[in-house]
Amino acid sequence: MKKIAVVGTGYVGLVTGTCFAETGNQVVCVDIDSKKVEKMRNGEVPIYEPHLDILFERNLKANRLSFTTNLEEGIKDAEIIFLALPTPPGEDGSADLRYILGVADDLGKLLTSYKVIVDKSTVPVGTAEKVHAAIAKHASVDFDVVSNPEFLREGFAVDDFMKPDRVVLGTSSERAEKIMEQLYKPFVRQGNPIVFMDEKSAELTKYAANAFLATKITFMNEIANFCELVGADVDKVRIGIGSDDRIGKRFLFPGIGYGGSCFPKDVQALVNSGLENQFSFEILKSVMSVNESQKTVLFPKIENFFRGNLKGKRIALWGLSFKPDTDDIREAPALYMIKALTGAGANVVAYDPEAMENVKAVIGDQITYAENEYAALKDADALLICTEWGIFRNPDFDRVKSLMKDAVIFDGRNLFEITEMNKKGFYYTSIGRKTCEK
């Protein structure tokens, strides 16, 4: 059993703290938001993540998981302190380290014995050195700084943490290495590796992984757009190239772009990190540009269908989160489509299983929010699908057709088979495939 402090209870911090408590560790989570801390003390999970609530409740009741706003109190008995703080993009797109370095500065004044400080946030290369320097400025005791990037997928974060395909640990300290290896042993019993490396390599590993996945998605979106021009079928192309082990089947599904808290921010931050070191990531610059335009790639199709006049048209929209199984709407393609549609005079009626409250907080009553997916369809001139939630994959098409004013679907996630849509009498257009005319 280790005594652990987690500073920051956002998405990464709360999953990290809860999962470490689940393996028998004593965890104190620290956050400056007193209202949030009070809610968590009372058993309220502030984010939506499948299965997190079960682990949270169990460990809160077992007193293995606790919360405080007091940093000194939170770290007092901890052997290991995780920093899970936001690194928002600055004005130039580079990662803003003020929260991490601010806490590091405070820690330097508070340390009374040896501790391992672990950077769990996604940070530019060289951040561990800056954290070490900020702590060392005030500290009178030994400490080590470790880079331990997270590789959690929203919607699968608990499973990803409990059964990681690898654990990356960046440290030059044998003492810290042994402590961290012992901490993570219960999570890699099936033989997946704990990969030790230097701090800078660990920091870059996280950025490189996200940038590669963003590039793979964007490449496939460009192939899909080209398929439409030449009459090829992106589904066939996807299967053809994905069967090659060197390429693999994952992250080859075309759509209306990536969003979320990681890919957009991390690709931009890596590009900026390159510029700071007189290096230009030309591929990643293109990835950002293509993804930005991909988010509204369906809008011209919608506009053309309605002959340039969307004023007063009622558009049902399924899916607001940037991906299924999360309530995260950061950089969600749906928001870009809403802006384009409402800007053209359309009335949008949206439904999402988890993200509607978050969207309300951002855009308020610019759109109408439906009670369920079918309620959104009433008298709709068209349906737009932006997120591939499971409940949208197999709807009652007869009911869909009866509710809508016209049987028209614009599918940004390629959920349905063209032949089936043709049989059912829908006008159906998607990404990288031929349009099904009624």
Predicted features and spans:
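Structural/interface elements that position substrates and couple domains in central-metabolism enzymes
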Residues: M1-K438
